[in-house]
């Protein structure tokens, strides 16, 4: 990692632990900062805080006392999940204390070039595809960021022979200043996380931070299926490389069942190892990045053909007596579920949907769920999802939790059917995250098979 001294002897407050906060605290300590960690979880239930304290890092747990900010901190590094209307963050900003996320730290110390991937849907799959293609080409793509590996941790061991392939959420991108990828990808932009950002325009602005420091020597890969992406083209200094499944573009595109890059066939769409129209878009974005990094077509084709998907994103779980189970717990919004359903015959699908109520109706989902065999509905948003099912003429049953929903869906299915968990909602009404929800689905399927 690069040796930097800008944090040496500076007082830094790390707000919120989890993986990224813990990694940031250790990195800042290594860089010579005077670190204080503040986390809301009680100390006795907080192994990360206990470990940091043993290493000599100051830890304050069990709440977020505003008087902590009476100290003169030079910087705050916040967990990306903590909203900016948190009183601690509001007070820090009012005092002129910069508030960053650990993604910024990763950029500052990284010897490796960075490819950043953001968007509303497809981030994890596209990030994984890019990482696998680059690694197959000998460029060693290191996955990091929102994909589960703290960027500031991975960056510490990356060399200039590696490439950091970083999945970036809007939450993370709100906390960057100097962050500068050589290639950035925005998979798509849809209204989501409005409860965090306040409006769609603010959400887009957060995503757009990915390109703030890019120049004409850098590449911004945009989805030209969306007019919004086309409109944004004039607002960046970066060189835009488009991808599209709807039209021929000066980049990566779909035509007559083939995936092209600038007029050259790379592979057939039906050779991609995972189903669904959304995965064609993900593959096109990957092809654009790979070609910009001089990866040959054969390597791209072989890697994407062998690609098995990622956990919780249209993940095939098992087959029980001819009923196939798919875990798409990562589909936390309407568009993601629409794309998941596009890969199946609705008449053979029992869909499990519902979760955190963000106040939105599901009318957009009605055409996509029409013709489903059945639905199993759960969660805070159940009443809203039921209204959409009624409009689509789909029969449904209600469930109390994911285990109950999985069992009921199996009872409704017959040989040749698919049980699809694709909630179109976040998990936080019942579960800590979509991974927990998906793992419970997987565990219940295993129990059903016994």
From Swiss-Prot:
It comes from the Bacteria. One of its GO terms (cellular component) is cytoplasm. Keywords: ATP-binding, Cell cycle, Cell division, Cell shape, Cell wall biogenesis/degradation, Cytoplasm, Ligase, Nucleotide-binding, Peptidoglycan synthesis. It is found in: Cytoplasm. It catalyses: UDP-N-acetyl-alpha-D-muramoyl-L-alanine + D-glutamate + ATP = UDP-N-acetyl-alpha-D-muramoyl-L-alanyl-D-glutamate + ADP + phosphate + H(+). ATP binds at residues 119-125. GO terms for biological process: cell division; cell wall organization; peptidoglycan biosynthetic process; regulation of cell shape. Its EC number is 6.3.2.9. InterPro entries: Mur-like_cat_sf, Mur_ligase_C, Mur_ligase_C_dom_sf, Mur_ligase_cen, MurD. Pathway: Cell wall biogenesis; peptidoglycan biosynthesis. GO terms for molecular function: ATP binding; UDP-N-acetylmuramoylalanine-D-glutamate ligase activity. Belongs to the MurCDEF family. Cell wall formation. Catalyzes the addition of glutamate to the nucleotide precursor UDP-N-acetylmuramoyl-L-alanine (UMA). PANTHER family: UDP-N-ACETYLMURAMOYLALANINE--D-GLUTAMATE LIGASE. This is UDP-N-acetylmuramoylalanine--D-glutamate ligase. It comes from Streptococcus pneumoniae (strain CGSP14). The gene is murD.
């Amino acid at each position: 990692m690069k040796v930097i001294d800008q944090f040496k002897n500076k007082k830094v407050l790390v707000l919120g632990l989890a993986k990224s906060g813990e990694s940031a605290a250790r990195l800042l300590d290594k860089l010579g900062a005077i670190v204080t960690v503040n986390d809301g979880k009680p100390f006795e239930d907080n192994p990360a805080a206990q470990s940091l304290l043993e290493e000599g890092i100051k830890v304050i747990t069990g709440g977020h006392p505003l008087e902590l900010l009476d100290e003169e901190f030079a910087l705050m590094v916040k967990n990306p999940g903590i909203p900016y209307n948190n009183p601690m963050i509001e007070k820090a900003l009012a005092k002129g204390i910069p508030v960053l996320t650990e993604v910024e730290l990763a950029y500052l110390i990284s010897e490796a070039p960075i490819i950043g991937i953001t968007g509303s849907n497809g981030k994890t799959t596209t990030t994984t595809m890019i990482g696998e293609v680059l690694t197959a080409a000998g460029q060693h793509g290191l996955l990091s960021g929102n994909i589960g590996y703290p960027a500031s941790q991975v960056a510490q061991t990356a060399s200039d022979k590696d490439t950091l392939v970083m999945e970036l959420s809007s939450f993370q991108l709100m906390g960057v200043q100097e962050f500068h990828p050589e290639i950035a990808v925005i998979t798509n932009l849809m209204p989501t996380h409005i409860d965090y950002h306040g409006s769609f325009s603010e959400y887009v602005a957060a995503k757009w931070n990915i390109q703030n420091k890019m120049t004409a020597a850098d590449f911004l890969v945009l989805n030209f299926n969306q007019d919004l992406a086309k409109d944004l083209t004039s607002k960046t200094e970066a060189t835009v490389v488009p991808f599209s499944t709807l039209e021929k573009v000066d980049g990566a595109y779909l035509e007559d069942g083939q995936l092209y890059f600038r007029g050259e066939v790379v592979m057939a769409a039906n050779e991609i190892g995972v189903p669904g129209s959304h995965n064609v878009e993900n593959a096109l974005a990957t092809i654009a990045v790979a070609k910009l990094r001089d990866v040959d077509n054969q390597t791209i084709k072989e890697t994407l053909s062998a690609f098995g998907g990622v956990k919780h994103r249209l993940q095939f779980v098992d087959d029980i007596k001819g009923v196939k189970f798919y875990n798409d717990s990562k589909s936390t919004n309407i568009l993601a579920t629409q794309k998941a359903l596009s890969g199946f015959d609705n008449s053979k699908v029992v869909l499990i949907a519902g979760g955190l109520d963000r106040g939105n109706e599901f009318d957009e989902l009605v055409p996509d769920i029409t013709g489903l065999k059945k639905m199993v509905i759960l969660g805070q948003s159940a009443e809203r999802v039921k209204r959409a099912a009624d409009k689509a003429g789909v029969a449904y049953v209600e469930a109390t939790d994911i285990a109950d929903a999985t069992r009921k869906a199996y009872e409704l299915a017959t040989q040749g059917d698919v049980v699809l968990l694709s909630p179109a909602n976040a998990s936080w009404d019942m579960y800590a995250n979509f991974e927990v929800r998906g793992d419970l689905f997987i565990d219940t399927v295993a129990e059903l098979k016994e």
